[in-house]
Curated annotation (Swiss-Prot):
Organism per entry: Chelon labrosus (Thicklip grey mullet)
Disulfide feature: C110-C187
Membrane-spanning segments: 37-61, 74-96, 111-133, 153-173, 203-224, 253-274, 287-308
Alphabetized UniProt keyword annotations: Cell projection, Chromophore, Disulfide bond, G-protein coupled receptor, Glycoprotein, Lipoprotein, Membrane, Palmitate, Phosphoprotein, Photoreceptor protein, Receptor, Retinal protein, Sensory transduction, Transducer, Transmembrane, Transmembrane helix, Vision
Taxonomic superkingdom: Eukaryota
Protein's name in the database: Rhodopsin
Length: 353
């Protein structure tokens, strides 16, 4: 084995010289230069500095403006709530431990950080699944006269939390575990060991199949069918141009969210699977650190995509920030009027960009 396994940790360095120490008790500066830990702490501070206000603003503006409280936007709000969980429960912990160079908060802190990171990522993934299914049902109409209502949105929200919890909770109760990874200042699922009594192998397979591959298959199926339906509708002119444009714009926004999720999380998933299937092989602490910390940037991109691509939300946000006035009233107002008209003819009653 090209690493050192201890009680609730695995460090990717053989302890031939006796230098390896528990990541819960000693700084891990023998793994990488101390400046790297300072850089990680600064990176996490930046994510908190941007992630908290932008997600809180998304939540506040949507609750403040009644016209934004549409069923589909409930799912988008769910993404903001999940991101806030990651920022407050995970990022603050990681920033603090990075500043100390080891997981100074101990096992409890590791469980908290690992849980919130996993929960937030899974809520985001399953929210994208619900959005993809909604787009498929509304645009492709496999169910005639279907309208995505508030009840459907609430069921979708409950579904995302149940599925995310089914992935994030088991390591807290003995099916696998959360341990420090990479530079030992952030925590994740134990892909590294076959520790007795934790059944890591079965959990990792369960997680990859049920909480990564199956959701992605559903998303790709829905958008594959959606692409065909949009082309057919455009060719046949079955619906008004306004309705088609509204549906296309909503679908485009959700597709970009899916692509951004894949860009952020696939490197982490790929490295984790490699480590799991090559347990005991040699790799450095940065091998997992880079994709793990890159994945954390997902807390920023969803609200940014929403703000950039949803003119109605952007108008409401500017109005809120400018004390009820929009200095870009002519431009944003025209866009909002156009989009409100498009929304009124959309069978999903959403607010597209």
């Amino acid at each position: 084995m090209n690493g050192t396994e201890g009680p609730y940790f695995y460090i990717p360095m053989v302890n031939t010289t006796g230098i390896v120490r528990s990541p819960y008790e000693y700084p891990q500066y023998y793994l990488v230069n101390p400046a790297a830990y300072a850089a990680l702490g600064a990176y996490m501070f930046l994510l908190i500095l941007v992630g908290f206000p932008v997600n809180f603003l998304t939540l506040y503006v949507t609750l403040e403006h009644k016209k934004l409280r549409t069923p589909l936007n409930y799912i988008l709000l769910n993404l903001a709530v999940a991101d806030l969980f990651m920022v407050l429960g995970g990022f603050t912990t990681t920033m603090y431990t990075s500043m100390h160079g080891y997981f100074v908060l101990g096992r409890l802190g590791c469980n908290v950080e690992g849980f919130f990171a996993t929960l937030g990522g899974e809520i985001a993934l399953w929210s994208l699944v619900v959005l993809a299914i909604e787009r498929w049902v509304v645009v492709c109409k496999p169910i005639s006269n279907f309208r995505f209502s508030e009840d459907h949105a609430i069921m979708g929200l409950a579904f995302t939390w149940v599925m995310a919890s089914a992935c994030a909770v088991p390591p807290l109760v003995g099916w696998s575990r959360y341990i420090p990874e990479g530079m030992q200042c952030s925590c994740g699922i134990d892909y590294y060991t076959r520790a007795e009594g934790f059944n890591n192998e079965s959990f990792v397979i369960y997680m990859f199949v049920c909480h990564f591959l199956i959701p992605l298959v559903v998303v790709f199926f829905c958008y594959g069918r959606l692409l065909c339906a949009v082309k057919e509708a455009a060719a046949a002119q079955q619906e008004s141009e306004t309705t088609q444009r509204a549906e296309r714009e909503v679908s485009r926004m959700v597709v970009i969210m899916v692509v951004a999720f894949l860009v952020c999380w696939c490197p982490y998933a790929g490295v984790a699977w490699y480590i799991f299937t090559h347990q005991g092989s040699e790799f450095g602490p940065l091998f997992m650190t880079f994709p793990a910390f890159f994945a954390k940037s997902s807390s920023i991109y969803n609200p940014m995509i929403y703000i950039c691509m949803n003119k109605q939300f952007r108008h409401c946000m500017i109005t809120t920030l400018c004390c009820g006035k929009n200095p870009f009233e002519e431009e944003e107002g025209a866009s909002t009027t156009s989009k409100t008209e498009a929304s009124s003819v959309s069978s999903s009653s959403v607010s597209p960009a």
